[in-house]
C-alpha cells in the first residue's frame, strides 16, 4: 500500500498540477482536502476535477461556523488590525485550515501534508507553523520551494497537466490572484504590482461597489452584541457566520471596506493588495462603538496594545502559541460587559454613528453635562490639576533655577 499525502486543494491550476507531481515525485496516494471558509461558488465541480487530476479521494470540509466563532470573533473583540488597515482576512483563516488538514491526515494515516503556497508569500509560514504546532511528526511538502518543481508559469503548468492526461479548461491569460472567504476577498497582481497605478475597480471588485456608485440614500442598520459577540442584525438573531454574510451584503452595496494597502510581509518584502471587507469593517466599527461606552480608559489603552500585538501574532502565523492564548484570555475578560445595541448609517463608503445603548454604559449624562450636577463639583478639578500637573511644574521650576544660575 502506498503512503498517503493530504493536499490542501483549491481546485485552481497550481494545486491541480501538484496532484500528478506528487504521484510522480513521491509515488504517494493523494488525498485532496478543500476547506470551505466561505469561498462560495469556487467550490463547484471540485470533486470531478480532483478525481480527473488523479486524486484518490476529496474531502470538502465546511468550517464557516468554526472560522467565524473561533477565529474571527476573538480578533474582532481584540480590535486586531495589522498595520492600521488590514483586517486579517487571509491570516485568520489559515490556522483553521491547518487544523483541519492535520485532522484529515490523522484520519487517513497520511505521512505528509502538502500545500501550494509560493516561497515568497506569508501563507507558507502560516500553514507550516500551524502544522508544526499540531503535528510535529508529519512531513510538510511545499513544491514551490523544491528544485524539482519546474513549472514557473501558467503555461508550463497547463502543459504539465496535459502531458499527464489532465485536460481541464484553465485559461492562460493572467488574472488577479484572489483569496476569498467569509470575511473578505483579497486581490493582488496585474496593475496592483505598480503602487503608482490606480486599481481598475470596474474589473477588480467582487463583493462591493465603489462609493461613487453606491446608492445616493443612506441605510440605517442596528446590531446587538452580548459579551462582545454579535447576535443580531436589524432585530433578526443569527449565527455569527450569517451576520457576516448579511453585513457583507449591506456593506458591499454601500461601498464599505475597500482598502488599497502596501503591507510588510513576514518574509521581508512589501506587497500591495486591494481588500474588500465590507461586513468585517462594519462589525469591527460597531464593536468599537459599543466598547466606547462600556470599557474604562485604562482597560481600553492596554487592550489597544494587545490588539496590535494579536494582529502581528495572527499575521505571522503564530495562532497555536501560548502568547495568542494569553492575549485572547485577557481580551475575553474585557468583554464581560460589552453588551448592547449599536445603530449606524451606511452611506457611500462611510459608517456614520447613529446611537449606542448598553445596560453597562459607563457614560453618565449628569457627569458629562456642562450644567451643574450633584455628582461632580467643578472645584474638585483644582486639586486634581495641581497634582496631575506637578511633574511638569517641578521640571519647569528646575529649568528656571538653572537658567537663573547661568545668567548670574
From Swiss-Prot:
GO cellular component terms listed in the entry, alphabetical order: cytoplasm
Domain of life: Bacteria
Localisation per UniProt entry: Cytoplasm
InterPro entries noted in UniProt: Arginosuc_syn_C, Arginosuc_syn_N, Arginosuc_synth, Arginosuc_synth_CS, Arginosuc_synth_type_1_subfam, AS_cat/multimer_dom_body, Rossmann-like_a/b/a_fold
Binding locations of ATP: 8-16, 116
Binding site for L-citrulline: 86, 122, 126, 177, 186, 263, 275
EC code(s) of this entry: 6.3.4.5
Pathway: Amino-acid biosynthesis; L-arginine biosynthesis; L-arginine from L-ornithine and carbamoyl phosphate: step 2/3
Positions of L-aspartate binding: 118, 122-123
Keywords: Amino-acid biosynthesis, Arginine biosynthesis, ATP-binding, Cytoplasm, Ligase, Nucleotide-binding
Annotated GO MF terms: argininosuccinate synthase activity; ATP binding
Signal peptide range in chain numbering: none
Principal localisation: cytoplasm
GO biological process assignments: argininosuccinate metabolic process; L-arginine biosynthetic process; urea cycle
Family according to the record: Belongs to the argininosuccinate synthase family. Type 1 subfamily.
Listed name of the protein: Argininosuccinate synthase
Amino acid at each position: 500500500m502506498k503512503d498517503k499525502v493530504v493536499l490542501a486543494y483549491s481546485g485552481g491550476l497550481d494545486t491541480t498540477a501538484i496532484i500528478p507531481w506528487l504521484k510522480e515525485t513521491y509515488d504517494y496516494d493523494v488525498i485532496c482536502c478543500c476547506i470551505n471558509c466561505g469561498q462560495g461558488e469556487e467550490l463547484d465541480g471540485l470533486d470531478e476535477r480532483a478525481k480527473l487530476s488523479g486524486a484518490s479521494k476529496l474531502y470538502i470540509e465546511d468550517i464557516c461556523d468554526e472560522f467565524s466563532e473561533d477565529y474571527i470573533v476573538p480578533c474582532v473583540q481584540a480590535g486586531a488590525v495589522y498595520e492600521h488597515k488590514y483586517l486579517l482576512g487571509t491570516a485568520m483563516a489559515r490556522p483553521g485550515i491547518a487544523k483541519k488538514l492535520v485532522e484529515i491526515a490523522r484520519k487517513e494515516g497520511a505521512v505528509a501534508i502538502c500545500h501550494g503556497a509560493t516561497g515568497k508569500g506569508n501563507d507558507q509560514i502560516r500553514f507550516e507553523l500551524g502544522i508544526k504546532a499540531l503535528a510535529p511528526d508529519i512531513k510538510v511538502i511545499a513544491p514551490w520551494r523544491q528544485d524539482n518543481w519546474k513549472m514557473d508559469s501558467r503555461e508550463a503548468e497547463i502543459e504539465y497537466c496535459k502531458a499527464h492526461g489532465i485536460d481541464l479548461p484553465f485559461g492562460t491569460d493572467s488574472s488577479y490572484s484572489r483569496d476569498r472567504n467569509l470575511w473578505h476577498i483579497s486581490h493582488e497582481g496585474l496593475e496592483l504590482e505598480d503602487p503608482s497605478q490606480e486599481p481598475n475597480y470596474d474589473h477588480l471588485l467582487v463583493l462591493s461597489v465603489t462609493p461613487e456608485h453606491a446608492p445616493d440614500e443612506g441605510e440605517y442598520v442596528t446590531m446587538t452584541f452580548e459579551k462582545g459577540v454579535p447576535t443580531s442584525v436589524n432585530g433578526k438573531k443569527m449565527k455569527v457566520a450569517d451576520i457576516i454574510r448579511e453585513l457583507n451584503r449591506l456593506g458591499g452595496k454601500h461601498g464599505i471596506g475597500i482598502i488599497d494597502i502596501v503591507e510588510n510581509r513576514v518574509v521581508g518584502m512589501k506587497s500591495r493588495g486591494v481588500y474588500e471587507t465590507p461586513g468585517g469593517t462594519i462589525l469591527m466599527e460597531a464593536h468599537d462603538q459599543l466598547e466606547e461606552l462600556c470599557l474604562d480608559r485604562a482597560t481600553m489603552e492596554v487592550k489597544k496594545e494587545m490588539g496590535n500585538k494579536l494582529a502581528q501574532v495572527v499575521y505571522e502565523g503564530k495562532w497555536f502559541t501560548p502568547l495568542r492564548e494569553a492575549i485572547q484570555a485577557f481580551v475575553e475578560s474585557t468583554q464581560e460587559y460589552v453588551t448592547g445595541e449599536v445603530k449606524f448609517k451606511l452611506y457611500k463608503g462611510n459608517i456614520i454613528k447613529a446611537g449606542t445603548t448598553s445596560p453597562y454604559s459607563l457614560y453618565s449624562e449628569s457627569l458629562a453635562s456642562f450644567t451643574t450636577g450633584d455628582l461632580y463639583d467643578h472645584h474638585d478639578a483644582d486639586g486634581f490639576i495641581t497634582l496631575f500637573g506637578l511633574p511638569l511644574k517641578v521640571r519647569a521650576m528646575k529649568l528656571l533655577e538653572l537658567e537663573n544660575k547661568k545668567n548670574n
